[in-house]
């Protein structure tokens, strides 16, 4: 699918696909599914901006979206373009028709900034099986793997160098505070796991046991792809090499196993019990996209991430139940 977008610079396209195979006989069924999707969408997440960091259009009578539409800003997108601002009068100029003036963001070579885009791709693979070797036993199992990758890329007009951990100077060694940037922030992820359970039923027993093993790995990253040189800097000091200004990895392991059983004492009385064990581990390390100030070069340092936590849970439960002619009562004890 595709769209031209209503706001300036918000054209986009997306798509998805699906495929699957199934094989079965009287006792065994095997399935495989592949599901994927992608999107590249122009963004306008700043909303309807009524001004800039220096002044507000509200000072010039713009208070509603209808006001903005009437003055030529109905499709204005601050991620795509800027408002002309007169620093002397602290006002936004208007043309003879009363429309506010806008300008497109430009690179140093004169080319126009195309648009801010969000880009993402994801693919899911799922294989499952059900096996019924007898009237008493049923086995279910599934494995899965999902890969995802995405990023957004945006123009950052008149941003501070310190926002990206940079200390910039000109030819006289004077500090330069601001410039135009293009930043790219994104992630990649791998998720995979296994699920299995077995069920046994006869005249007296109903038993179920299962296993769940899940693992997630993710990476967050950020790059500075462009810095305008129009501000005249000749040197930049920063705490990282190249144009990657942060990078962090994270993982989650989630493992659990359970067993439950119900025994029919009589036609009206049952006893039941179950127990679950769960283990969860979180880990993340690397560099955050926030910076702290230093008294000497490189003048800034990335915030460090260092989390490594594990948790274990054991949850038992037991009880007795009574049921007759549509009525049911039970008593149970559990530990959570």
Predicted regions and their residues:
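Membrane-embedded beta-strand positions of outer-membrane beta-barrel proteins
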Residues: 1, 21, 32-34, 141-143, ...
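Outer-membrane beta-barrel proteins
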Residues: 1-24, 41-45, 97-128, 179-193, ...
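Transmembrane beta-barrel wall of Gram-negative outer-membrane proteins
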Residues: 1-3, 8-44, 53-55, 59-85, ...
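Transmembrane beta-strands of outer-membrane beta-barrel pores
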Residues: 2-4, 25-27, 36-40, 145-149, ...
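Flexible, surface-exposed loop regions and adjacent strand-edge segments
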Residues: 12-16, 47-57, 61-62, 155-166, ...
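Residues on the lipid-exposed face of transmembrane beta-strands in outer-membrane beta-barrel proteins
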Residues: 19-23, 125-131, 141, 194-200, ...
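Repeated loop/turn-to-beta-strand initiation elements of outer-membrane beta-barrel proteins
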Residues: 27-32, 136-139, 204-207, 268-271, ...
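Structural signature of Gram-negative outer-membrane beta-barrels, strongest in the C-terminal barrel
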Residues: 212-216, 239-336
């Amino acid at each position: 699918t595709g769209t031209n977008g209503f706001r300036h610079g918000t054209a986009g396209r997306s798509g998805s696909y699906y495929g699957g195979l199934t094989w079965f006989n009287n006792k065994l069924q095997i399935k495989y599914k592949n599901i994927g999707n992608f999107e590249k969408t122009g963004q306008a997440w700043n909303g309807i901006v009524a001004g800039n960091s220096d002044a507000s259009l509200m000072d010039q009578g713009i208070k509603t979206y209808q006001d903005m539409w009437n003055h030529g800003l109905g499709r204005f997108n601050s991620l795509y373009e800027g408002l002309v601002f007169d620093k002397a009068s602290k006002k936004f100029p208007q043309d003879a028709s009363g429309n506010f003036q806008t300008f497109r963001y430009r690179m140093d070579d004169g080319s126009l900034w195309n648009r801010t885009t969000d880009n993402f791709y994801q693919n899911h693979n799922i294989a499952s099986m059900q096996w019924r070797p007898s009237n008493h036993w049923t086995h279910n199992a599934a494995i899965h793997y999902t890969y995802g990758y995405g990023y957004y890329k945006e123009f950052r007009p008149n941003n501070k160098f310190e926002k990206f951990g940079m200390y910039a100077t000109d030819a006289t060694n004077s500090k330069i505070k601001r410039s135009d940037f293009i930043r790219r922030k994104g992630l990649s992820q791998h998720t995979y796991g296994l699920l299995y359970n077995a069920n046994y039923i006869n005249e007296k027993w109903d038993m179920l046991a299962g296993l769940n093993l899940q693992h997630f790995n993710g990476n967050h990253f950020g790059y500075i792809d462009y810095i305008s040189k129009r501000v005249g800097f000749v040197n930049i000091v920063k705490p990282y090499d190249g144009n990657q200004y942060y990078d962090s990895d994270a993982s989650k392991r989630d493992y659990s196993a359970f067993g439950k059983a119900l025994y029919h004492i009589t036609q009206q009385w049952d006893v039941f019990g179950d127990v679950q064990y769960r283990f969860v581990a979180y880990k993340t390390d690397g560099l955050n996209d926030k910076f702290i100030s230093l008294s000497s070069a490189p003048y800034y340092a990335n915030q460090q991430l260092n989390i490594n936590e594990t948790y274990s849970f054991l949850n038992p439960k037991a009880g007795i139940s009574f049921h007759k002619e549509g009525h049911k009562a039970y008593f149970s004890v559990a530990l959570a």
